[in-house]
Amino acid sequence: LNQVIETLLNHRSVRDFEDKPLTWEQVETIVASAQAASTSSFLQAYSIIGVTDREKKEKLAEVVGNQPYVAKNGHFFVFCADLHRHAVVGEMENVDVTSPIESTEKFMVAVVDASLAAQNAAAAAESMGLGICYIGGVRNNLEAVRQILKTPDHVLPVFGMAVGYPASLNDRKPRLPLRHVYMENEYQQDEQLYKKQLEEYNEIVAGYYAERTGGKRRDTWTGQMASMLEKKARMYMKEFVAKIKMNIR
């Protein structure tokens, strides 16, 4: 395997960082790598906010669910789906772009663009010996995040990313087997096979937790997912997204 593939396959989330800031050169390289990601129709419909102000980082750490690694890391990035720039383009070119930038299609484009950029950033950071952790908790209270980061309409903070020097490393979590996520020619709809594969994966995940905790935990993947999905989390999202004039057409 080449170094790129080894870096990708060695990914694990880091939640314990040294209190050591990244250099500007490191930040610049990570952002440049993010910008090199594919983007739909050259729209580049995202922005990246680097949060260096300690007070803002501490506020964000509280808002996202009291996650200390949001405040203590080398650098904290927030990746935003951004169509505000395109509203400005409409003004500059004297073209009414209201309907397109408020459409579901352009909303999806912006979220995908932000996600592709973020994954490039993650790969770049890890190739530099740094650790990363995506922070979906940014979406716990988007109104508060919006106030902290002063984002305008047509800009949605999608997730954060803590980056820094790992103080400790977690084990890599086993992923779903390839045969369960890769399908050729058509979607696999054999429910019995589907369930059999998930039961096999449950054994792998339970073994992972048992080894990691000395036998104290034997969580299954389906059990974890069922517990998470039965909670009505972030049900305000549709209304908030409409409030900032996205995904309403």
Where in this protein do the model-derived segments appear?
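Acidic, surface-exposed loops and disordered segments
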Residues: 1-249
